[in-house]
Structures are given as structure tokens and as C-alpha cells.
A protein has these predicted regions:
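Active-site rim loops that border cofactor/substrate pockets in soluble metabolic enzymes
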Residues: 1-27
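C-terminal functional extensions of proteins
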Residues: 21, 31-32, 38-123
Length: 123
């Protein structure tokens, strides 16, 4: 597997530009978090919502623990965005969040039409 954030960035920026609202859910941090946040900045829109789950703490200087207030100051997340930073183990926290979201969405949940993959029935 080859991971190349520079090749992914134009596609992510394009998705951000076409989407009526943008958000991110980041588990951990590092390059994936920075790539998504940079796409929001490049699209000149900023994120409308953000969830960051990390074990890193801003007090000790861990980059993955940089606060959402910092991302707002860069324009990567809108100041009025719904945002939360969860300090905890993703192996515990993530399944609980997913179960809660799926329960709230119910049977009416549908993928945004502009994000549906082509050729597989929109699943």
C-alpha cells in the first residue's frame, strides 16, 4: 500500500468544495488529520463540525493533541462549528460513538448523492 497525502489532497479539496457542509472525525492525528484540515483550508470553507479522538494532550506538546481552538485560528475549522476533542482510547470511545450515531440516524440514513460510488448501486 502506498500512502501519498499530496496525491490525495486535490481530491479531498474537490470534495470539500462541492459539499454543502464539511466535517471531520479524526482518530489519532498526524498526517491524516493535517491532510483533512489542509483540504478544508485550501477549499476556503473550513469544517462545519469536527470530532478528534486522541490520547495525546496539548499540555505536553504532542502535535496530535493540538486543540480545536488552534485549528479555528488557522481557518481549518469554523469558529461556529460543532466541535469536540475527546481525550481517550479510540478502541473504547469510537465504537460507542458509532453505535450512538447509527441509532440516531435510523433507517432514513442515506449517503450524500455526490459522494455515492459509481457502479455499485450507491451503497
Amino acid at each position: 500500500m502506498l500512502v501519498d497525502a499530496f496525491k490525495d489532497l486535490p481530491e479531498i479539496v474537490s470534495i470539500c468544495k462541492r459539499s454543502p457542509r464539511n466535517g471531520m472525525m479524526v482518530i489519532g492525528g498526524g498526517v491524516p488529520r493535517n491532510t483533512v484540515q489542509s483540504a478544508a483550508l485550501a477549499s476556503k470553507k473550513g469544517m462545519d463540525y469536527a470530532v478528534i479522538m486522541t490520547m495525546d494532550r496539548p499540555e505536553i506538546g504532542g502535535l496530535s493533541g493540538s486543540t480545536l481552538e488552534e485549528t479555528v485560528s488557522w481557518g481549518k475549522v469554523k469558529s461556529a462549528a460543532n466541535k469536540i476533542m475527546v481525550i481517550g482510547d479510540a478502541m473504547i470511545v469510537f465504537p460507542i460513538i458509532v453505535a450512538s450515531v447509527l441509532e440516531r440516524l435510523g433507517e432514513d440514513f442515506k449517503r450524500a448523492p455526490y459522494l455515492k460510488p459509481k457502479g455499485i448501486g450507491g451503497i
